[in-house]
Amino acid sequence: MVTKEQRRQKIKARVRGKISGTQEKPRLTVFRSNKQIYAQLIDDIAGRTLASASSLKLEMTGSKKEIAAKVGDEIAKAATEAGISTVVFDRNGYLFHGRIKELADAARKGGLKF
């Protein structure tokens, strides 16, 4: 029987074969744990992280969805400071629902296009 984590890893590998980030259009990848949420802008060609934001850095209170939205705002601010306006969204095998959706919507409101 395939567990949820094995399913996510399988989807992640399949999607990563199809999308890649560049300097001009980096990959916005999201990692979600039970308590925290992390977002990174990655240039896959150079193998560098251009910007990052996480709920650990912000030390916020509120619901998990509210915190995810704040992380989305922070990654959008970091991207505009780095001169990035368009990204490729990598949900990392997670369903586009709940905290992942909140982060993506907040990043879009912050000015990122994907």
From Swiss-Prot:
Quaternary structure (record): Part of the 50S ribosomal subunit; part of the 5S rRNA/L5/L18/L25 subcomplex. Contacts the 5S and 23S rRNAs.
One MF annotation (Gene Ontology) recorded for this entry: structural constituent of ribosome
GO BP: any one term: translation
Xref: Pfam families: Ribosomal_L18p
InterPro entries on file: Ribosomal_uL18_bac-type, Ribosomal_uL18_bac/euk
NCBIfam families (alphabetical): L18_bact
UniProt superkingdom: Bacteria
Any one Gene Ontology cellular component term annotated for this protein: cytosolic large ribosomal subunit
Protein name: Large ribosomal subunit protein uL18
UniProt record similarity statement: Belongs to the universal ribosomal protein uL18 family.
Keywords: Ribonucleoprotein, Ribosomal protein, RNA-binding, rRNA-binding
Job description of the protein: This is one of the proteins that bind and probably mediate the attachment of the 5S RNA into the large ribosomal subunit, where it forms part of the central protuberance.
Gene that this polypeptide is encoded by: rplR
